[in-house]
From Swiss-Prot:
It is found in: Plastid, Chloroplast. GO terms for biological process: translation. GO terms for molecular function: structural constituent of ribosome. Coiled coil: none annotated. This is Large ribosomal subunit protein bL33c. It comes from the Eukaryota. The lineage of its organism: Eukaryota, Viridiplantae, Streptophyta, Embryophyta, Tracheophyta. Pfam families: Ribosomal_L33. InterPro entries: Ribosomal_bL33, Ribosomal_bL33_CS, Ribosomal_bL33_sf, Ribosomal_zn-bd. The gene is rpl33.
Length: 66
């Protein structure tokens, strides 16, 4: 049986560049990735450099709330 708080949780990473520009006419949406993080090793918000298909470059993707 599972315990109350799981150590490994699923998080959603969203492109900070797409959100900051306000979805202008050039971009068709916001890039999102789904990944997992270990709550004990990374208690703060996760930020990774991933490829954004809407910006056509590698940008910082930050963790968002569900």
């Amino acid at each position: 049986m599972a315990k109350g708080k799981d150590v490994r949780v699923t998080v959603i990473l969203e492109c900070t560049n797409c959100v900051r520009t306000g979805l202008n006419k050039e971009s068709r949406g916001v890039s999102r990735y789904i990944t997992q993080k270990n709550r004990h090793n990374t208690p703060s918000r996760l930020e990774l450099r991933k490829f954004c298909p809407y910006c056509y470059k590698h940008t910082i993707h930050g963790e968002i709330k569900k």
